[in-house]
Amino acid sequence: MSEIADKVKKIVVEHLGVEESKVTPEASFIDDLGADSLDTVELVMAFEEAFSVEIPEDAAEKIATVKDAIDYIEKQKAA
Amino acid sequence: MGIVSPLGLGLEHNWSRLIAGESGIGRIASFDPSDLPAHVAGEVPTGPTESGCLTLSDWVPVKDQKKMDRFIHLGLVAATEAVEDSGWKPESEEDRCRTGVMIGSGIGGLQTIYDASITVHEGRARRLSPFFIPSALINLVSGHVSIKYGFKGPNHSVVTACATGVHAIGDASRLIMLGDADVMVAGGAEAAVCPLGIAGFSSARALSTAFNDAPDKASRPWDRDRDGFVMGEGAGIVVLEEYEHAKARGAKIYGEIIGYGMSGDAYHITAPAEGHEGAYRAMQAAVRSAGISVSDIGYVNAHGTSTMADDLELQAVERLFGDAGRQLAMSSTKSAIGHLLGAAGAVEAIFSILAIRDNVAPPTLNLDNPSTESVIDRVAHEAQRRKIDIALSNSFGFGGTNASVIVRGV
């Protein structure tokens, strides 16, 4: 797993208080990990802070799963 | 009923420590108060649950804790104890809709607002937590309690500074009387022992500063050496229920709310009117609504904050009781736990009910030399065994708001 993926996973575990094993790439923040709409806002902020990236609102709305987050951040970092 | 206070966690633990004359007041530990004028406060002790201290994760899941200010944490702790103690677990949708919540706070999430202000001030507004607003809002204790237990009845909250707790209990009992609910979870929660809270009340010259080196002596209602109140934190919650409803399900009934009175001073933002005539009218209205005579009241839990206003409240009680004052016990339990602001009235109403249950008047600590003599026994230093059938509890708040509630054993 990439360094980014590791860090994303850690942030999700910390913010949503879920077990690490549940944070699979396919896991949906809302459907699988018990987040509500405010949790996802906070999560996106935490990603922005941790990776020093800007995630505009329209992009944030499309981040539904752990993989979505990793892909988006990897793309930003590669750019 | 449920309490979390500077004396610790849990109804019986609080009561036994109070009756034993113990103090929950100490040097502020949650932050360094050295730069502030007042160094003492009543903070909820942290430690293992079984020792009567607070381990927050036993009550609020860790991942939810950061979504709530501490006053909501403390409100949830006391509400959990109260609801579980009541045995009320509505199963049907109808019963859930007939169960409401009215928990207030004097100030709400002060530390949360302070922290958020700094984030914005530093130009990091876009980093502000989405939980900032719901963490700080006063009515969110009621909201969280309703979500936790599925109580779908009236969801309300009270904000009347230091009169909040009595107003919440009184107003909730009225909602039951009016038929809006059968059961109401009511009370107050406060957690303003933070730099901004201490600094703010210090600026208003309201806090004790002369006993920074002897914290347990700082709260001394009616004593000639008193020099201001000591802030405390905590929550007191009761479950109120329509009498026949409670009887029908065989509920444990501690007591009955029989009287409630309110008034406004229309005088000054922080100082009570001469002779505390607003307090007099609130108590008078409560006695009238209870349909009793003052001589039926055996115990008064005074507002008694350890400020100059103590003697004015005493005057108002003397005026109301007249000769019946000779048989009366009146104490201020703020001498042991400090002033819990919006939670004070609720915690003190609970103490009043336990005073009836056990026929014990809790003591006024540190009342070494009363600044004014009185025929009323103010229960100095030690608890007193005496027959108490009916008790009255007073709470008065900034803005000139006064509330009194009268309770009776069942």
Swiss-Prot record, chain A:
Positions of the Carrier domain: 2-77
Subcellular location: Cytoplasm
GO cellular component: cytosol; membrane
Molecular function GO terms recorded: acyl binding; acyl carrier activity
One GO-annotated biological process of the protein: lipid A biosynthetic process
Alphabetical keyword list: Cytoplasm, Fatty acid biosynthesis, Fatty acid metabolism, Lipid biosynthesis, Lipid metabolism, Phosphopantetheine, Phosphoprotein
Signal peptide boundaries: none
Family membership noted in the UniProt record: Belongs to the acyl carrier protein (ACP) family.
Function per UniProt: Carrier of the growing fatty acid chain in fatty acid biosynthesis.
UniProt cross-references to HAMAP family, sorted A to Z: Acyl_carrier
The protein's name: Acyl carrier protein
